[in-house]
């Protein structure tokens, strides 16, 4: 399970270093292979261990090619999906296309989301998290049915 937020630098080749605490698990359980794609709702990237991505692929495969919205989701999620193999130093290469989508520059935020990571441009992450925290006491959140029984 991936959790927490880590600030990471991107080198001049577009590589990021996966935090040390995740490397052994990713190598042992996922052969050090991850899949990176775009988030269709946010200006960030989604980084899945290979086995988790295979589950996502099955869900994408189950969508209809004849429904325009479902086909769009397949096209974007699968079309941008790129395998990233960790090197000996625990780094992965993010393609220029993926970096451009998320407007990634020198500093990024790697955000653990249980079975995957989100990769954000630093300033966009700060803005998004401020917006998310402000929503905490809003009527919209208080009236959300899915959250009414959530006990933390």
UniProtKB/Swiss-Prot annotation:
Cellular location of this protein?
A: Cytoplasm, Nucleoid
Q: Which Pfam families match?
A: MraZ (PF02381)
Question: Which keywords does this chain's UniProt record carry?
Answer: Cytoplasm, DNA-binding, Repeat, Transcription, Transcription regulation
Which SUPFAM superfamilies does this entry report, sorted A to Z? AbrB/MazE/MraZ-like
Is-annotated flag, keyword Translocase? no
Where does the UniProt entry say this protein principally localizes? cytoplasm
Every copy of the SpoVT-AbrB domain together lies at 5-52, 81-124
**Per its record, what are the GO molecular function terms?**
DNA-binding transcription factor activity; transcription cis-regulatory region binding
Key word DNA-binding present? yes
Q: Name one GO biological process term.
A: negative regulation of DNA-templated transcription initiation
Q: Which cellular component terms (GO) are annotated to the entry? A: cytoplasm; nucleoid
**Its quaternary structure?**
Forms oligomers.
Entry's family note: Belongs to the MraZ family.
Name it: Transcriptional regulator MraZ
Q: What is the lineage of its organism?
A: Bacteria, Pseudomonadati, Pseudomonadota, Gammaproteobacteria, Pasteurellales
């Amino acid at each position: 399970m991936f959790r927490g937020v880590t600030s990471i630098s991107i080198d001049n080749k577009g590589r990021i270093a996966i935090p040390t605490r995740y490397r052994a698990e990713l190598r042992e359980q996922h052969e050090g292979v991850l899949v990176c794609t775009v988030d269709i709702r946010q200006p960030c990237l989604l980084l899945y261990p290979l086995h988790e991505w295979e589950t996502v692929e099955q869900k994408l495969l189950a969508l209809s090619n004849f429904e325009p919205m479902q086909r769009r989701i397949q096209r974007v999620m699968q079309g941008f999906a790129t395998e990233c193999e960790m090197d000996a130093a625990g780094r992965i290469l993010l393609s220029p296309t993926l970096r451009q989508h998320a407007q990634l520059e020198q500093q990024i935020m790697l955000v653990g989301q249980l079975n995957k990571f989100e990769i954000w441009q630093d300033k966009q992450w700060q803005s998004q998290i401020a917006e998310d925290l402000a929503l905490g006491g809003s009527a919209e959140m208080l009236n959300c049915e899915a959250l009414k029984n959530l006990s933390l």
